Amino acid sequence: MKQAIGFIDSGVGGLTVVREVLKQLPHEQVYYLGDTARCPYGPRDKEEVAQFTWEMTNFLVDRGIKMLVIACNTATAAALYDIREKLDIPVIGVIQPGSRAALKATRNNKIGVLGTLGTVESMAYPTALKGLNRRVEVDSLACPKFVSVVESGEYKSAIAKKVVAESLLPLKSTKIDTVILGCTHYPLLKPIIENFMGDGVAVINSGEETASEVSALLDYHNLLDATDDEIEHRFFTTGSTQIFKDIAKDWLNMPDMTVEHIKLGK
């Protein structure tokens, strides 16, 4: 019987990481929990985000996952090190992989970071980037409207184009040549963001680099699954199963997926 990789996020954003993992590791089984009812996490204080992150973690650990991916930048910034220290399974977040990918891409060491208010205020990306390259200059920009655009399924709409243009205008006058999508919801807006920023700016989806790290860590711990046993992905949400399913089946190309509704907290 397969053991699943667990993924947690404040909503549907972490599906962008799941997609990259399943591209690289098609034999793996996924358990995903999106806390859509309490999304967004960005405006919440760190202690509350950490509490919510632990609630999601415990839910999936109780279901026997072999590894945990905190597929949410705000949750990674608030709780990664505490969870990693206390669990006896491998745990990774999305900030370090995204930082490494950006440093590979930049030519002038000027990097922009788009994130939620919580991620930007945590200084997690500048800390990670400067820890890897002291010469790098970082411009961080909170884009609080992006998550609601994605969660409402409007990420391909004219509304999305307007919100992106208004939000990213401050970055146009900078000399950045690389932008990190510092929230796992944002890759669903990547085509619009790339179009607005122009050809000279590389837009980094940390999901790809995170997937590579998942693969390496599973291999290191001898947890990779290469068997042809039946795969039973499970998707859980605290919010609307229909809205979650509409976005997830499109993004993951899983038309027959089932989404289960759960409750967390009090």
Swiss-Prot record:
Query: What is the reaction catalyzed?
Result: L-glutamate = D-glutamate
Q: In which pathway does it act?
A: Cell wall biogenesis; peptidoglycan biosynthesis
Mind listing the GO molecular function terms for this protein?
Answer: glutamate racemase activity
For this UniProt record, give its keywords in alphabetical order, as a comma-separated list: Cell shape, Cell wall biogenesis/degradation, Isomerase, Peptidoglycan synthesis
One Pfam family, please name it: Asp_Glu_race
Q: Where is the active site?
A: 72 (proton donor/acceptor), 183 (proton donor/acceptor)
Looking at the keywords, is Transmembrane helix present?
Answer: no
Q: SUPFAM superfamilies annotated for this entry?
A: Aspartate/glutamate racemase
Q: Might you give the EC number(s) for this enzyme? A: 5.1.1.3
Fetch the PROSITE patterns from UniProt: ASP_GLU_RACEMASE_1, ASP_GLU_RACEMASE_2
Q: Which terms does the UniProt entry file under GO BP?
A: cell wall organization; peptidoglycan biosynthetic process; regulation of cell shape
Which InterPro entries does this one have?
Answer: Asp/Glu/hydantoin_racemase (IPR015942), Asp/Glu_race (IPR001920), Asp/Glu_racemase_AS_1 (IPR018187), Asp/Glu_racemase_AS_2 (IPR033134), Glu_race (IPR004391)
Positions of substrate binding:
9-10, 41-42, 73-74, 184-185
EC primary class: isomerase
Function of the molecule? Provides the (R)-glutamate required for cell wall biosynthesis.
User: Could you tell me which NCBIfam families the record lists for this protein?
Assistant: glut_race (TIGR00067), PRK00865.1-3 (NF002035)
Per the similarity annotation, which family is this? Belongs to the aspartate/glutamate racemases family.
Q: What is this protein called?
A: Glutamate racemase
Q: Which organism is it from?
A: Listeria innocua serovar 6a (strain ATCC BAA-680 / CLIP 11262)
Q: Coding gene?
A: murI
